[in-house]
Amino acid sequence: MASRKEALARRANRVRRHIKSVANGRPRLSVHRSSKNIYAQIIDDVAGKTLASASTLDKDLRGSLKTGADTAAAAAVGKLVAERASKAGVTDVVFDRGAFIYHGRIKALAEAAREGGLTF
């Protein structure tokens, strides 16, 4: 039986393998969720560079959020990463949820990023 970390890595690799097959050169919006914070970055896999990033630890958000571990914080990160992506000239991305299910904070971030102008 696989350990928790091995199962997490297996799920993340399965999602990323699917993303690479459908990306067609589009950058990916990668999301990571910890127990206290949430992080999002837009990565160009062809060039190997991060085009935009945002998290609940950013100075822009830290003072305005009560906590980094709720859906309101995730939505704020989604809007911020969409705003930074538009400044970088990115509008079309592939959503990389990693091993996290599309529910709760991950879903709130994705919907806020869509409202902010990203399409996926």
Swiss-Prot record:
It comes from the Bacteria. Keywords: Ribonucleoprotein, Ribosomal protein, RNA-binding, rRNA-binding. One of its GO terms (cellular component) is cytosolic large ribosomal subunit. GO terms for molecular function: 5S rRNA binding; structural constituent of ribosome. One of its GO terms (biological process) is translation. SUPFAM superfamilies: Translational machinery components. This is one of the proteins that bind and probably mediate the attachment of the 5S RNA into the large ribosomal subunit, where it forms part of the central protuberance. Part of the 50S ribosomal subunit; part of the 5S rRNA/L5/L18/L25 subcomplex. Contacts the 5S and 23S rRNAs. Belongs to the universal ribosomal protein uL18 family. This is Large ribosomal subunit protein uL18. It comes from Rhizobium etli (strain ATCC 51251 / DSM 11541 / JCM 21823 / NBRC 15573 / CFN 42).
